[in-house]
């Protein structure tokens, strides 16, 4: 920000907030809809409740302060819950969207024993993670988990169906998201870690277009620094903008900050549509 014109930044400072705190400060009301996902309106109250439940469930799965949580999800509500839950327990999300071998390498280096992926992960992919890293099990998230199935148009259902292999991951090493949350209810210990805005929160990998793919680490401090400098234009009493996000993967920090957290923090309605094909974006824009 030192390169910005002085008149633009003279009254701008980076808040000393966690991501959870920043979103709460900019929440227009707990009964206001924060996210729309395939026919379901998700209120701010539900977002905060799910962040708490996810944090407890992560503790119940053995994650703690300083741990890395590998997440291979599209931009579904569960990704938001995992990000906020990870911050609460002092852990960081590890996201990579490269080849299977590169993804396994990232998990191996993280030493994580549990990974998160959609339920269209194949049994063969799960076997590869278990064989070549310390992965013991995967928590699977259905694209339909937070959606209203009857409200999903046919072209979106078809696009989702195309992701499923002949043999999706199954058995005792594949744990459903809702069971993951249920098991977390039994965790009796302390959930939240000491507050630290400079602790690693989000780990992403570069594309590798200019050399070997490298991990880049972001904290709440750096993420909010980027978020806050863009958070000028929000809703008004007369008009609340909508923000449609389609196929961009949340394995990039720019997507997480600028495309997910920014609309939420500036009182825009975030519409998550991660399974829309690029050629169907016009259909979705007309729908919303």
Label every PLM stretch briefly.
Residues 90, 224-243, 250-288:
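Conserved AMP-binding/adenylation subdomain of ANL enzymes
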Residues 33-84, 100-104, 218-221:
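Conserved AMP-binding/adenylate-forming core of the ANL superfamily
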Residues 48-53, 183-187, 216-237:
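Conserved structural elements of the adenylate-forming
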Residues 43-45, 192, 201-228:
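Conserved AMP-binding A3 loop
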Residues 31, 158-205, 212, 236-243:
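Conserved pre-ATP/AMP-binding loop-to-beta segment of ANL
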Residues 73-84, 98-101, 247-265:
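Conserved coil-to-alpha-helix start sites within the AMP-binding
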Residues 3, 21-43:
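AMP-dependent adenylate-forming
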Residues 88-179:
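Structural core segment of the AMP-binding/adenylate-forming
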């Amino acid at each position: 920000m030192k390169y910005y014109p002085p008149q633009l930044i003279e009254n701008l400072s980076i808040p000393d907030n966690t991501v959870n705190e920043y979103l709460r400060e900019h929440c227009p009301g707990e009964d206001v809809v924060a996210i729309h996902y395939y026919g379901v309106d998700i209120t701010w109250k539900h977002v905060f409740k799910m962040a708490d439940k996810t944090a407890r469930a992560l503790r119940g799965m053995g994650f703690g302060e300083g741990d890395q949580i590998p997440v291979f999800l599209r931009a579904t509500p569960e990704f938001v819950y995992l990000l906020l839950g990870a911050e609460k327990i002092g852990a960081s999300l590890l996201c990579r969207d490269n080849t299977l071998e590169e993804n396994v390498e990232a998990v191996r280096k993280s030493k994580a024993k549990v990974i998160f992926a959609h339920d269209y992960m194949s049994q063969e992919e799960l076997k590869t993670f278990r064989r070549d890293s310390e992965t013991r099990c995967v928590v699977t998230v259905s694209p339909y988990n937070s959606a209203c199935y009857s409200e999903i148009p046919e072209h979106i259902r078809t696009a989702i169906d195309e992701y499923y292999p002949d043999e999706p991951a199954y058995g005792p090493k594949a744990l459903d998201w809702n069971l993951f949350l249920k098991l977390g209810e039994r965790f009796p210990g302390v959930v939240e870690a000491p507050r630290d805005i400079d602790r690693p929160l989000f780990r992403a990998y570069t594309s590798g277009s200019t050399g070997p793919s490298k991990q880049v680490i972001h904290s709440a401090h750096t993420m909010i620094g980027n978020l806050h400098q863009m958070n000028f234009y929000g809703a008004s009493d007369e008009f609340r903008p909508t923000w449609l996000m389609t196929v961009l993967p949340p394995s990039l920090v720019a997507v997480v900050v600028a495309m997910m957290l920014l609309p939420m923090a500036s009182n825009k309605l975030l519409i998550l549509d991660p399974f829309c094909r690029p050629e169907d974006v016009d259909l979705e824009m007309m729908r919303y």
